[in-house]
A protein has these predicted regions:
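Acidic, Ser/Thr- and proline-rich intrinsically disordered linker/docking segments
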Residues: 35-114, 148-209
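Conserved beta-hairpin
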Residues: 1-36, 106-149
Length: 209
């Protein structure tokens, strides 16, 4: 098992289960309000020869006690002059920090959304409003939908909703289906994605592997 002192990247580190440090300033983990994370690997090919994978990673830590979130970026090598295994190691270090913080702060971040749900009747995520009865209101025009009428799919950074349309029973129905694309929406999940997935699993019975 990794000790908390191993969760360190440049000027950011997890000191223990209650404290993080950034640029020699310490913050309480209980004051974390949101976490953002993304890790992307890109295959690098030079003259048709596979050179390995270049990795990028991003971590955002929002705090009650800091006016601006903490941002940690590793943008990858973008060059053949570095061993690509090194880029994976650096990205994995940031991912390990995220996973540890996500574990330590999961309940308090869930409680933030549940508090809004209790007071407003919905929780807000990625500018959309989610109601326990299955209604979702997106910020775009005509953005009020019933989640049960949509197919959900997921990528590493987004959830997509695509309208489920009944199979047409007439020739004209088939023509109309080809002419009109199903309504679709996207929800970016890089911030508090673990919490969002837990909430829609609980309220909408939607889950992935």
């Amino acid at each position: 098992n990794k000790s908390d002192l191993d969760y360190k990247y440049k000027k950011f580190s997890i000191m223990d289960d209650k404290t993080i440090e950034y640029k020699r300033e310490r913050f309480k983990i209980m004051d974390i309000t949101e976490l953002g994370f993304h890790h992307k690997g890109t295959k690098v090919v030079t003259n048709f020869v596979p050179m390995g994978e270049d990795h990028e990673a991003y971590l955002m830590v929002g705090l009650k006690t800091r006016s601006k979130p903490i941002h940690i970026n590793y943008r990858g090598a973008h060059t053949r002059k570095i061993i690509f295994e090194d880029t994976f190691t650096k990205a994995l270090t940031i991912e390990s920090i995220y996973r540890r913080l996500a574990e330590l702060t999961f309940k308090q971040r869930v409680d933030k959304y549940l508090s809004e749900l209790e007071s407003e009747g919905y929780f807000t995520y990625a500018q959309a409003k989610f109601f326990p009865n299955g209604e979702i209101i997106f910020p775009k025009k005509n953005g009020r939908v019933d989640q049960s009428n949509y197919h959900f799919s997921r990528t590493s950074s987004d959830v997509f909703l695509k309208e489920i349309k009944p199979e047409p029973t007439t020739v004209w129905g088939h023509v109309k289906k080809k002419l009109h694309d199903p309504i679709s929406y996207s929800i970016p999940t890089s911030v508090d994605g673990d919490v969002f997935f837990a909430l829609i699993k609980h309220y909408y019975k939607r889950s992935w592997g």
